[in-house]
């Protein structure tokens, strides 16, 4: 998994490329956990995510709850169909703000 961070209209965008599984979930938890600790709105760009395991789902939920406690807006964007299907089947989509594209997510968070 590769993580890349950049700013777009006062929104921190974290792009995830590759698989989010038990081997890579701790890296995302550490990196994203720091971002939602109070730096403003955060968009998680999942457009290059290849696979999402139960460990990845767990980390996303933990980070979602941390963002809520900190008052940080967190949006997931650009999910491939397979990733969206996993999140929908498990009910995880209900916990997150979701945007179809990164641009739409940034626009919503910057408003």
Listing of model-derived features with the role each one plays in the protein:
Residues 1-3, 29-30, 106:
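Short low-complexity stretches enriched in small and charged residues
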Residues 97-111:
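A charged, well-structured terminal subsegment
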Residues 14-16, 44-45:
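Conserved beta-strand segments of the P-loop GTPase G domain that flank and frequently precede/overlap
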Residues 22-96:
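Amphipathic alpha-helical interaction surfaces in cytosolic regulatory modules
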Residues 8-10, 47, 79, 103:
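Conserved catalytic submotifs in the C-terminal HATPase_c
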Residues 4-6, 77, 99:
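General small-molecule cofactor/ligand-binding pocket signal
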């Amino acid at each position: 998994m590769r993580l890349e961070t950049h700013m777009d209209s006062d929104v921190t965008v974290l792009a995830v490329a590759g698989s989010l599984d038990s081997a890579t979930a701790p890296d995302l938890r550490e990196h994203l956990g720091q971002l939602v600790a109070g730096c403003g709105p955060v968009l998680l760009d999942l457009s290059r995510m290849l696979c999402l395991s139960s460990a990845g789902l767990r980390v996303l939920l933990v980070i979602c709850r941390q963002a809520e406690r900190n008052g940080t807006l967190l949006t997931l964007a650009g999910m491939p169909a397979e990733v969206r299907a996993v999140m929908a089947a498990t009910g995880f989509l209900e916990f997150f703000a979701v945007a179809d594209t990164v641009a739409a997510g940034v626009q919503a968070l910057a408003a």
